[in-house]
Amino acid sequence: MTQLTNIVSNDTLVNLQEEYDKTQIQEVLNELNQELIGLVPVKTRIREIAALLLIDRLRRKLELVSGNPGLHMSFTGSPGTGKTTVAMKMADILHRLGYIKKGHLLTVTRDDLVGQYIGHTAPKTKEVLKQAMGGVLFIDEAYYLYKADNERDYGSEAIEILLQVMENQRNDLVVIFAGYKDRMEKFYESNPGLSSRVANHVDFPDYTSEELLQIAKMMIEEQQYCFTEEADKTLLEYTERRMKQPYFANARSIRNAIDRARMRQANRIFASGEKVLTKADLVTIEAEDILKSRLFSLPNN
């Protein structure tokens, strides 16, 4: 009770706004809003984590004792929903707040961690961890690390090493596991020791067709192209059709569609026989450049 009274009666002041401005994390949060369309639940969750870490930083300045906040994370969602981009921003936030020393992001998959024969996995995993120290290790499609149907698989060895480092060197490294939500849930069920070390779970929703159209416009502007009004409508229809097809990968699929539209635009211009071109000719994507996709020849179920 005495200790609590001392804390409550202590009139030491800390300036939250000053600390917030000093870390410049608002700059990263602004980038997140500008660079990623939609994803409101994700952005909200990242702001919540940033707020927790900022307050924890202030508490430590006043020597208020509390356990270190759990920083390891799980990003779940379909491909192309911005998981890697958000991981990069999270690494930047953690660095600015002083929770990691370097702030870099190292992205790996099973192949980078797991060997093909006895004695090969440990050196591979340890080398990756060495490279990731002081930053964030992003393990994409993490569920491939564990193969329950194969007792001789070496993935479990990599997981054991990860567990040790996540616990013993949590002040030097943050690990983010990523993948499809349903598979990640099974992965954690099979590895309870891993699940207990992951404090922050962030679910990435699929984009709507309207959001994907906004993303397409952002991508096309970055490459100094533009859509005609009719091309806008055609791309929206393309997106709605593509979302119903197998292997749809959100923004990644839209980027591929734009690349193909650019190729068709180039071929259209080349085939026209025009020898003198205007700037408008070179930057404009027409509806026909999208309509020639084989997707429009398929039944729209």
From Swiss-Prot:
For this record, an example GO cellular component is:
chloroplast
> The organism's lineage?
Eukaryota, Rhodophyta, Bangiophyceae, Bangiales, Bangiaceae
Q: Which residues bind ATP?
A: G77, S78, P79, G80, T81, G82, K83, T84
Q: Organism's domain of life?
A: Eukaryota
Q: Which family does it belong to?
A: Belongs to the CbxX/CfxQ family.
Please provide the record's keywords in A-Z order. Answer: ATP-binding, Chloroplast, Nucleotide-binding, Plastid
Record's function text: Necessary for the expression of RuBisCO.
Identification of the protein by name: Protein CfxQ homolog
GO function term, MF aspect, one: ATP binding
Where, per UniProt, does this protein localize?
Plastid, Chloroplast
- Underlying gene: cfxQ
Q: Which organism is it from?
A: Porphyra purpurea (Red seaweed)
